[in-house]
Amino acid sequence: MELSLLNIKGKDTGKKVVLSDDIFAVEPNNHAIYLDVKQYLAHQRQGTHKAKERAEVSFSTKKLKKQKGTGGARAGSRKSPIFVGGGTIFGPRPRTYGFKVNKKVKDLARKSAFSHKLKESNVTVLENFTLNAPKTKDYLAILKDLSLDTKKTLFVIADIDKNIILSSRNLKKAKVVSVDQINTYDLVNADKVVISEGSVSKIEALLN
């Protein structure tokens, strides 16, 4: 699969970039995508929820009333879950929501996401570039030249570039990741995926 290489002005440079069919032209596996996205979102949960049970609420342990003769039900402790303010029965406890997804499945999910985006013509390959300073205005100008300023865009760069990352951080619909930070959720969530020329070989090395 070949794509035209664009410069930061959105113009065709006349060069072609070859993308591996093993990554960008596989039959998308929706279940693999589902599992990887589900795992990613599960790991975002704090899991710090907690409700006090009867052993943890603070009340006197004195028997509320005598055992017999009142005509009412027996009551031994104010901490009982049947009373307002008493302990919670089977309440939430701190837990980890994460679960394991095999590496082969995760790789297949990312390949499927890339292939799906390319099939819909939502992948662009961009010439390598750097910014002299972290300026949101400069990064936004690049997105406008690429007609991507109104779309959710995932920009994949070969290595972490502090100026590019800081320049994009304040833009709600723009996200920049290095190759080793690519995840299925970001790929699926983006309207457009922009790949720097230098990151193509690294993506192939990561997923092959």
From Swiss-Prot:
Q: Which GO terms describe its molecular function?
A: rRNA binding; structural constituent of ribosome
Record keywords, A-Z? Ribonucleoprotein, Ribosomal protein, RNA-binding, rRNA-binding
Keyword presence, Secreted:
no
Cystine residue pairs: none
Q: Name one GO biological process term.
A: translation
Asked if the keyword Cell division belongs to this entry, the reply reads no
What name does the UniProt record give this protein? Answer: Large ribosomal subunit protein uL4
Subunit structure as annotated in this protein's UniProt entry? Part of the 50S ribosomal subunit.
Q: Which HAMAP family match?
A: Ribosomal_uL4_B (MF_01328_B)
Physiological role: One of the primary rRNA binding proteins, this protein initially binds near the 5'-end of the 23S rRNA. It is important during the early stages of 50S assembly. It makes multiple contacts with different domains of the 23S rRNA in the assembled 50S subunit and ribosome.
Tell me a GO cellular component: ribosome
Gene symbol of the encoding locus: rplD
Q: Which NCBIfam families match?
A: rplD_bact
Positions of the UniProt region annotated as Disordered: 51-79
Q: Which SUPFAM superfamilies match?
A: Ribosomal protein L4
The similarity comment for this entry is:
Belongs to the universal ribosomal protein uL4 family.
InterPro entries according to UniProt: Ribosomal_uL4, Ribosomal_uL4-like, Ribosomal_uL4_dom_sf
